[in-house]
Amino acid sequence: MKDYTLSEFLNRRLALLGERNNLSLLEQCLHGIERECLRVTATAELACTPHPQALGAALTNGQVTTDYSESLLEFITPALKNPAETIDNLDRIHRFVYSKLGDELLWSPSMPCPLPDEEHIPIAYYGTSNIGKLKYVYRKGLALRYGKTMQCIAGIHYNFSLPEDAWALLKQTEDFAGDARDYQSHSYIALIRNFRRYSWLLMYLFGASPALDAGFLRGRKHQLEQHFDADTLYLPYATSLRMSDLGYQSDAQADLTPCYNDLVSYTDSLRKAVATPYKPYVEVGTHDQNGEWVQLNTNVLQIENEYYSNIRPKRVTYSGERPIQALVARGVQYVEVRCLDINPFLPTGISLEQSRFIDAFVLYCALEESQQLARHECSNASSNFLSVVKEGRRPGLSLMRDNRPVDLKTWATELMEKITPIARLLDQAQGIDEHLKSIAVQQAKIDDTALTPSAQVLASMEAHNEGFTAFSLRQSQVHAEYFRTHPLSAQEQADFEAQAKTSIEEQAELEATEEVVDFDTFVGSYQASILSISN
């Protein structure tokens, strides 16, 4: 390990955190995971059945809910200090869900199964309360703007935070004019800038969607190649077609690139987008000819979460509070990494070893010096990311760094050298060697592209002479067998069932006791709430 490659800034911060009295701060980082996955039939068709009541109410169950569709489940772990407990929690949620799924399966990869016509993809339903109806109309708006097919892509979201005491410690040694909350927000935004610079590395290491079902494209033009079978499209060197420009494409969002210079400019750009009409949406309006809502408003974004990004600054919201309101009022609390594919070879879609590396990587982004992104850097970051998701395993692939080409493997290895001392520090804090082991596993992938998940997906399809759907169904069946043969303990099962029952009661109570405000007025108040925010 060449420590001299580290910046003086990073070395100073690592030395401070590595002091005996401070090392325990690194044990207090929090990790949470959200995993989306489609429910499918035994024949790999979308399960168009309602969200199983035995899983509770999607509106009020904090661990098992739905994302875009009734068929798209989302599993949410609490934020825990030990990532092993986070992964174990995710595993238990899967086992509970499988106990209630009947003959249905959880789809193993990020890219969807063969989908029915758009009108037959069911939008998630959240009941008759105003907030439930708002969530439903928002999803109708997404269908109108982007189509339902795109909304059926699944992923892993990884939430990470440092303890506030760690930021307070770092602030003491740095010349920063604001208060502790401002410094913490400033530091998380700096983390996001570095994440923009280096997140292509995560796509190389963990991208797992090099192929998809041809029907996903709905006849649109593309540059993919047909291979394996008539219904499979792929790119030979792709790592993550999910994160490529095949996914979300939005003319309305094309000019919306929130500035990550500071929290104020970020929240201002999003607030402007949720308050600025967009002509094609205005022409459609908010209601159809029958007077039914079709979208919440005609602005660039209906709500701030509609903005699609690889990482978000976050703050836990109070009841009825919007994400921007929480950020403006109380600053950034954690980041949500949103670009991770589901690994179809893993029952939960993510492993503890991967989690260890992500911790070290995100911590590197947090602790390394992070100048504001110049215009060419923003452009380079976007083009590097797109290059890696579409052809990251291409031999000799070059990326752009400081406006000069650099070999991907050279740059990736340099980044590994810089992340290694952070992994070592995390290991020292926790009395383990797992973070350094994870670095070695990732370096092996850099040295040999065949070890990447994307290459392994294609190799498995080739070895079994099967297309995308057959491969995905086979993996889904393997994982179903694993979860069904490893049931929860009686107490764990009872706890999940009690939580599901409570969530149904909570939704019923909400619907029964809600103040009588008509939905139009409720939406108007919700929209007005964002216009009244002042930084």
UniProtKB/Swiss-Prot annotation:
Determine the domain of life of the protein's source.
Answer: Bacteria
Q: What is its EC number?
A: 6.3.2.2
Q: Which UniProt keywords apply?
A: ATP-binding, Glutathione biosynthesis, Ligase, Nucleotide-binding
Class in the EC hierarchy, top level: ligase
Q: Pfam families per the record?
A: Glu_cys_ligase (PF04262)
InterPro entries with a match to the protein in the record: Gln_synth/guanido_kin_cat_dom, Glu_cys_ligase, Glut_cys_ligase
Pathway stated in the Swiss-Prot or TrEMBL entry: Sulfur metabolism; glutathione biosynthesis; glutathione from L-cysteine and L-glutamate: step 1/2
Q: Which GO terms describe its molecular function?
A: ATP binding; glutamate-cysteine ligase activity; metal ion binding
Q: Does the keyword Cell membrane apply?
A: no
Catalytic activity as recorded in UniProt: L-cysteine + L-glutamate + ATP = gamma-L-glutamyl-L-cysteine + ADP + phosphate + H(+)
Please provide, in alphabetical order, the Gene Ontology terms of the cellular component aspect for this entry. cytosol
Listed as disulfide-bonded, the cysteine pairs are: none
For whether the record's keyword set contains Ligase, the answer is yes
* UniProt-listed GO biological process terms: glutathione biosynthetic process
* Family statement: Belongs to the glutamate--cysteine ligase type 1 family. Type 1 subfamily.
PANTHER family listed in its UniProt record: GLUTAMATE--CYSTEINE LIGASE
Q: What is this protein called?
A: Glutamate--cysteine ligase
Organism, scientific name: Pseudomonas syringae pv. syringae (strain B728a)
